[in-house]
UniProtKB/Swiss-Prot annotation:
Keywords: Cytoplasm, Isopeptide bond, Nucleus, Ribonucleoprotein, Ribosomal protein, Ubl conjugation. InterPro entries: Ribosomal_eL40_dom (IPR001975), Ribosomal_eL40_sf (IPR038587), Ubiquitin-like_dom (IPR000626), Ubiquitin-like_domsf (IPR029071), Ubiquitin_CS (IPR019954), Ubiquitin_dom (IPR019956), Ubiquitin_ubiquitin-like (IPR050158). Residues 1-76 form the Ubiquitin-like domain. One of its GO terms (molecular function) is protein tag activity. PROSITE patterns: UBIQUITIN_1, UBIQUITIN_2. This is Ubiquitin-ribosomal protein eL40 fusion protein. The keyword NAD does not apply.
Amino acid sequence: MQIFVKTLTGKTITLEVESSDTIDNVKSKIQDKEGIPPDQQRLIFAGKQLEDGRTLSDYNIQKESTLHLVLRLRGGIIEPSLKALASKYNCEKQICRKCYARLPPRATNCRKRKCGHSSQIRPKKALKK
């Protein structure tokens, strides 16, 4: 049977499948046509995300049904070198006790006029883990 897969760009892909095919199988056919790895594909039918181990018949997908293809959301871990760089610029600071301005690590007086260039500064507190 023939089904259609609509991408976010509006492009429609036609696939030749059987109702006994698994969602994994459909994703690999999409990879063959479009080059998108299956682990980045999310298929939606009737408002539900399709699970990899199930078959097309489990979701009542019949001939000429349209599936919607969306890509997995990216994100997650920050690379350790970037985390160290960010902590150097964000965590190793001095804080003015009067106006709460962030100051360079070696500062002795506040740079702001509103607190009268106060010498009452403290190190910035460490982030909780």
